[in-house]
Curated annotation (Swiss-Prot):
Keywords: Chloroplast, Membrane, Plastid, Sugar transport, Transit peptide, Transmembrane, Transmembrane helix, Transport
Chain segment of the transit peptide: 1-40
Protein name: Triose phosphate/phosphate translocator TPT, chloroplastic
Species for this entry: Oryza sativa subsp. japonica (Rice)
Membrane-protein topology: Multi-pass membrane protein
Main location: plastid
Length: 417
C-alpha cells in the first residue's frame, strides 16, 4: 500500500501540472504520505501551467517537460493565444530545440580542398603576372636597382595601410627582435636586387633556370655552414639539377655573365636568408615578420639605388621611359609590379601554412614551370633544343630533390611526435 499511495500521489501531481484552471484544495482530504503532500503542494503552486493533455503520441508527459527553459518562476498566461503558444512550445520535441542551436558549417569548412586550390591558383597567377610585367618594364626602363626599391616600397605601403585598418593587427617589435631580423632582411634585400639585375639582363626563362640551383646552395650551406649532415639521396638528386642548368647555359641565346653571376649571387643570398631565418624564429605571425623584413630591406636598398642609378635616372632615365610609354603607364606599371610582387610572396606564405611541406615543394616546382612556359610564350623567346632539354632536366631534378627532402622532414616529425 505505501507504494500504491506514492504512485497515486505522483499521478495527482502530474494531473495538477496539466490542468489549466487553478485547483481548489479540499481541507477534508488527508495526505498521510509526505510525498503525496509535497506533490499536492507543487500542483497547487503550478496549477496555472497551460493544459497540454496528459498523453502525447501515447506517452505520459513528465512535469519537467512543461517547465520553461529560462527562469525558475512560472508566469500565468495572459491570453488564450499565449496559452496555445505555450502549449506548442511545451509539446515540441527536444530534438527540434537542439537542432536550432547547431551552427551550420561555413564554406571554408565544407570545401577546404577548393580553398587550397584557390590559394595555389592565386600564387601561380600572381607570380606569372609579376614576372611578365617586370620583364616588360625592363624592356623600356632598364634600371633594376630602382625597380627593386619600388617593389619593396609598394609592399611597405601595403603593409602600413593593412596595419592601419587592423588587417592584420600590427605585432609589437623591440630592439632584440630587430637585431634578429636585420640579417634576414639584409640577405633578402641582396637576393632581391641581384634577382632583378638578372631578370633585366637575360631572358626570364633562363634566369629561372639558373635559380633552380638554389636547392644545391641550400644543401651545401646546411652541410658546411650549419654542420648538419645532408643525406646521400639528396645530394644525388641534385646532380640532374646541376647538369640541366649547365646544358641550358651553354646554348642559351640570351646568356651574359652579368645575368648569370647575379642569379648565382641571388641563390646564395636566399640560402643565407633561410639560415638566418631559422636562427631568428619568433612567435610573430608570418605576415608581420614579412612586413618588418620588407621595411628593413627597403631601407637597405635605397642607398645603392641612389648611388648606382640616381645620376642616370635624373639625366635621361625617367624622361626616356615617359617618352616611350607615357607617364600614366609608366607610373601604373611600377605600382602594379610592386603590388604583384608583395601579394605573390604573401600568398606563397599563406599557401605554405595551409598544406604539407611536400605539397608546397611540388607546387613550387610547378610554379617555376608555369613561369618559364608563359614567359617563352609571351615574349617569344627563341631557345635551342639543348637549352630546352637542359631546362627540363633541371626542373625534374628540383622536383626529385623537393620530394625526397619533404619525405625526410615528414619522417623526422613522425619520429619526434
Amino acid at each position: 500500500m505505501p507504494a500504491l499511495g506514492t504512485l497515486s500521489g505522483g499521478a495527482a501531481g502530474v494531473a495538477g501540472l496539466l490542468r489549466l484552471r487553478r485547483a481548489t484544495p479540499s481541507p477534508a482530504v488527508a495526505t498521510p504520505f509526505p510525498a503525496a503532500a509535497a506533490a499536492r503542494c507543487a500542483a497547487a503552486a503550478a496549477a496555472v501551467v497551460p493544459d497540454g493533455g496528459q498523453l502525447v503520441w501515447g506517452r505520459q508527459l513528465r512535469p519537467a517537460l512543461l517547465l520553461p527553459a529560462a527562469g525558475g518562476l512560472l508566469q500565468p498566461p495572459t491570453s488564450p493565444s499565449s496559452s496555445q503558444a505555450g502549449r506548442r512550445q511545451a509539446l515540441r520535441p527536444p530534438a527540434a530545440a537542439t537542432s536550432g542551436e547547431a551552427k551550420p558549417a561555413g564554406f571554408l569548412e565544407k570545401y577546404p580542398a577548393l580553398i587550397t586550390g584557390f590559394f595555389f591558383f592565386m600564387w601561380y597567377f600572381l607570380n606569372v603576372i609579376f614576372n611578365i610585367l617586370n620583364k616588360k618594364i625592363y624592356n623600356y626602363f632598364p634600371y633594376p636597382y630602382f625597380v627593386s626599391v619600388i617593389h619593396l616600397l609598394v609592399g611597405v605601403v601595403y603593409c602600413l595601410v593593412s596595419w592601419t585598418v587592423g588587417l592584420p593587427k600590427r605585432a609589437p617589435i623591440n630592439s632584440t627582435l630587430l637585431k634578429l631580423l636585420f640579417p634576414v632582411a639584409l640577405c633578402h634585400a641582396l637576393g632581391h636586387v641581384t634577382s632583378n639585375v638578372s631578370f633585366a639582363t637575360v631572358a626570364v626563362s633562363f634566369a629561372h633556370t639558373i635559380k633552380a640551383l638554389e636547392p644545391f646552395f641550400n644543401a651545401a650551406a646546411t652541410q658546411f655552414v650549419l654542420g648538419q649532415q645532408v643525406p646521400l639521396p639528396l645530394w644525388l638528386s641534385l646532380a640532374p639539377v646541376v647538369l640541366g642548368v649547365s646544358m641550358a647555359s651553354l646554348t642559351e641565346l640570351s646568356f651574359n655573365w652579368t645575368g648569370f653571376i647575379n642569379a648565382m649571387i641571388s641563390n646564395i643570398s636566399f640560402t643565407y636568408r633561410s639560415i638566418y631565418s631559422k636562427k631568428a624564429m619568433t612567435d610573430m605571425d608570418s605576415t608581420n615578420v614579412y612586413a618588418y623584413i620588407s621595411i628593413i630591406a627597403l631601407i637597405v636598398c635605397i642607398p645603392p639605388a641612389v648611388i648606382i642609378e640616381g645620376p642616370q635616372l635624373l639625366q635621361h632615365g625617367f624622361n626616356d621611359a615617359i617618352a616611350k610609354v607615357g607617364l600614366t603607364k609608366f607610373v601604373s606599371d611600377l605600382f602594379f609590379v610592386g603590388l604583384f610582387y608583395h601579394l605573390y610572396n604573401q600568398v606563397a606564405t599563406n599557401t605554405l601554412e595551409r598544406v604539407a611541406p611536400l605539397t608546397h615543394a611540388v607546387g613550387n616546382v610547378l610554379k617555376r614551370v608555369f613561369v618559364i612556359g608563359f614567359s617563352i610564350i609571351v615574349f617569344g623567346n627563341r631557345i635551342t633544343t639543348q637549352t630546352g632539354i637542359g631546362t627540363c632536366i633541371a626542373i625534374a631534378g628540383v622536383a626529385i630533390y623537393s620530394y625526397i627532402k619533404a619525405k625526410i622532414e615528414e619522417e623526422k616529425r613522425a619520429k619526434s611526435a
